[in-house]
Each structure stands twice: as structure tokens, then as C-alpha cells.
């Protein structure tokens, strides 16, 4: 067959299935038969028209697992292998790439955002962007990328065992950060405005403490992570940070952040942005899943098929209160 099915977002608020040519093999790349796709907040934003600098139509999907159709040139991937797709396409030559930080490549293109992604039956990606997922289920493999974003933020913070750590925002990225902060030995407090989200979080991480916005105890923390996507919440982060602490911004928003310099300075605050993830983060996540330290079965709360995704995704976009991660079975 030379054609495949793809889920297209032709414009904000619209989705349709479309027949497209299957990608052709080319040097240095591997074709992947997509098996599972995690739906990210970015996908909901693309559907809703809230993603800036995006050109429609677009095939969404960057949280991907599938089966390799070709062998990689170095022999690490064989046909039929279950693989996790690293969706960050990088130039390899800019300052960030040369310095070991391709996650913030100056010319980065993310599958499903800047170029067409994986809500389809097959894609072709650079072989360096495929990581064998031996020992993982196909569903778990599709969740590695979003978990790696949380793991990367935690790695940036260099948490010490026992560090009192506040994570604001109990969506998927906040939960990912909470999971890996706990794995690093931190004492985790998870905060959100939604009682429903906090109840979900408690089911995923029963060892973490939770509190609702508006009911906070007036205490400070060694590290604060923001995963809200709210400028107001991000600007308030210093209120909860102890002296000598680290503030990590997992969220990115369009706008300016403002901190009172005396509060920022007297804490000798370490302020960190965290963007995407590195191969080492993907590897760490997969190792932790294999060891049973990541409750992947409790994270995948909803699922659908590619044929039904055009009907289900708008429903989930309208109300994500009871949803952690929805998975499309291709």
C-alpha cells in the first residue's frame, strides 16, 4: 500500500481523517509504524488555535511509540523493534547543539508542531531520534517523552535527597516532575487550583502531599517548580521559595515575567528555565519505568483509536478535569 491514514487539523477547531502517501525511506532515517500517540497539552492548544507560530494544516502528535520498519545504520534498531521517538529535530551545528544542549537548538523543529507529526500510520525520522524501548509496553513507550520533560526539569534543579519541593500545577508535566522529584529523594508537595486534579494526582502519587490553591500553608521550599502555564502563578513563585532555593520554570507563556528584585536577590535565587529533554532524560525515564518506579498504568486514563480520535479529541479538549493522559491507538 502506498497510502496511509492521517488525522489532520486543517484549521483551529477542525479535525479530519485524510489519505496521504506513506513516507519513503531515505539515508540516515528510519521509517516507523506508529502504534501509540499520547495527546499533549500542545495538541489541545493547536486544535483550539492557541498555539502561536503554527502553520495549518498540521498533523499533530509528538508523544510517539511504534515499530521500526528499517534497521539503523549503527545496528541499534532492527526492523520490528519497539522504539520511542524523540520528536526534537535539531540542526547539530548551532551553539546549543555543539554544547550538548540540542533540546534548545536554535533551529529546533518539533514533530507535530513545526512539521507534521505522528497522528498517522507511518513517519520517517532521523535514526538518532529513535530509542529502543525494550521491556516497555507500547502504551508506556508513548508516555516517555512527556515524562522526560519532567525528568529534565528535575535534573536541572539538582535536588538533594530530602529537599522540600513544591510543584505548582498538577497536569501531566507537573505530575512528571513530581514523580522524578520523588525518585530523586525529594519531599514533594503538589499544588493545583482544581480539587479534581489533586484527587487524580493523589491516585498517581499517594506518597506526595497535595494542597489546593487558596488553602496553602505559609511555608517555603528548597525548590519550586511551575507547571501551570499561568503568568500570575509564575510571578508568585518567589513567595514560596526559601532562601538559597531554586525556581524552575517548566511552563512557557507569551508575555513578561516580573519579580521584585529585593525578594529575588536576598534569596540568592537560582532561576532555571527547562525546555524539552535530552537523550539522557529519555534513558532515565525508560530505566525507571522498567524498574517499576513510574506508575504508567495510572497515568494513561483515557484512550481511543485513530479512527475515533477526531470525535474524542474535541471532547477531551473541552474538559480535561478527569484526564491525565489520553492515548491514541493507531
Regions found by a protein language model. Name each.
Residues 136-213:
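Mid-domain Rossmann-like dinucleotide-binding core that forms the NAD(H)/NADP(H) cofactor-binding site
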Residues 23-37, 50-95, 134-136:
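Glycine-rich beta-strand-centered segment in the early N-terminal region that forms part
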Residues 216-224:
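A short acidic, Gly/Pro-enriched loop at the edge of an enzyme's catalytic core
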Residues 2, 235, 279-330:
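C-terminal hydrophobic helical "lid"/dimerization subdomain
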Residues 50, 193-194, 253, 277:
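Residues in the short beta-alpha loop(s) of Rossmann-like NAD(P)-binding domains
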